[in-house]
């Protein structure tokens, strides 16, 4: 990554090299269809959290599945310890267990936050890279219960993962929610913009940024929804989102990569799109302050 002047990495060269090497190893294993234990899959982020002054790791909770502990990992990024208002954004991946590209892309993005600190200025980010750990371990879209967790939100679901994520989202009252997915029927990268017009204004440049890595899905109908230049303004019911009664509403964006594209290209597209969303949102806030 070209950091440019005044954008010195918050990681030492040694720590950065360790994180990058772990990321290469994880990508290699995933590309070869090898199932990694959760802690091995998340190794790049776990190493980064050991060395970074800005990233810390914990979980929403731990439970036992088939005799082994599983958990929903959570990572928190804040560039400095200065107490001030920050834009609160939650970024979620792995709600479908058979979509590893979003997990890898999100880990790359968190590494970029340390390597180019200006990127995270004015933000407090809450990162949830594996929201469906039992689905990941089974390599299935659904969780171990057979439920598609991304159709269960705000419906009084009995699914443990959904209940924990709902509680987290309700408590955080995010200014923005971003979800990462992959579509095995898509020829290119696209996204959903939900909420007010801001989501669409953020998504359009994010898709343009992702085009450095993957083509845009320009079909007029995507996944059964009307689309314009890769942007869909409708969505399925029960998806991961803010509580129905949250006011003001956050911007909500869903990024979708073409699942059959090379994993390296998908992860790069996710990173580029996420970087664009933060950059464009910061411009929006600055513009509003000048009005």
Regions found by a protein language model. Name each.
Residues 97-98, 262:
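Glycine-/small-residue-rich active-site loops that bind phosphorylated ligands and cofactors
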Residues 2-75:
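Short glycine- and acidic-rich boundary segments immediately preceding or forming the N-terminal edge
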Residues 230-291:
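Active-site-adjacent mobile loop/cap segments within catalytic or ligand-binding domains
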Residues 85-88, 100-225, 243-246, 250, ...:
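Active-site/substrate-binding loop(s) of hydrolase catalytic cores
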Residues 66, 81-84, 98:
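Short glycine/serine/proline-enriched coil/turn segments at secondary-structure junctions
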Residues 80-81, 114-119, 284-288:
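Alpha-helix termini
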Residues 73-85:
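Short beta-strand-to-loop junctions in surface cap/lid or active-site-entrance loops
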């Amino acid at each position: 990554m070209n950091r440019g002047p005044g954008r010195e990495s918050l990681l030492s060269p040694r720590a950065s090299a360790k994180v990058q090497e772990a990321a290469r190893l994880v990508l290699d294993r995933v590309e070869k269809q090898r199932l990694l234990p959760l802690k091995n899959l998340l190794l790049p982020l776990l190493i980064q959290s050991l060395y970074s002054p800005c990233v810390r790791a914990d979980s929403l909770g731990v439970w036992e599945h088939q005799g082994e502990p599983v958990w929903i990992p959570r990572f928190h990024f804040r560039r400095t310890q200065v107490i001030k208002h920050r834009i609160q954004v939650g970024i979620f991946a792995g709600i479908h267990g058979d979509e590893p590209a979003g997990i890898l892309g999100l880990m790359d993005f968190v590494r970029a936050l340390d390597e180019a600190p200006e990127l995270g200025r004015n933000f407090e980010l809450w990162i949830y890279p594996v929201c469906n750990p039992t689905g990941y371990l089974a390599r299935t879209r659904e969780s171990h219960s057979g439920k598609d967790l991304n159709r269960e939100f705000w419906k009084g679901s009995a699914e443990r993962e959904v209940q924990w994520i709902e509680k987290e989202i309700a408590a955080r009252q995010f200014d923005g929610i971003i979800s990462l997915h992959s579509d095995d029927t898509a020829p290119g990268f696209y996204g959903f913009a939900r909420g007010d017009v801001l989501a669409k204004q953020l998504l359009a440049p994010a898709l343009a940024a992702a085009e450095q890595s993957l083509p845009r899905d320009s079909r007029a109908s995507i996944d059964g929804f009307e689309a314009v230049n890769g942007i869909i303004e409708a969505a399925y019911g029960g998806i991961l989102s803010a509580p129905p009664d949250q006011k003001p509403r956050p911007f909500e964006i869903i990024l979708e990569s073409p699942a059959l594209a090379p994993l390296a290209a998908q992860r790069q597209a996710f990173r580029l799109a996420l970087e664009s969303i933060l950059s464009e949102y910061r411009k929006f806030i600055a513009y509003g302050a000048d009005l």
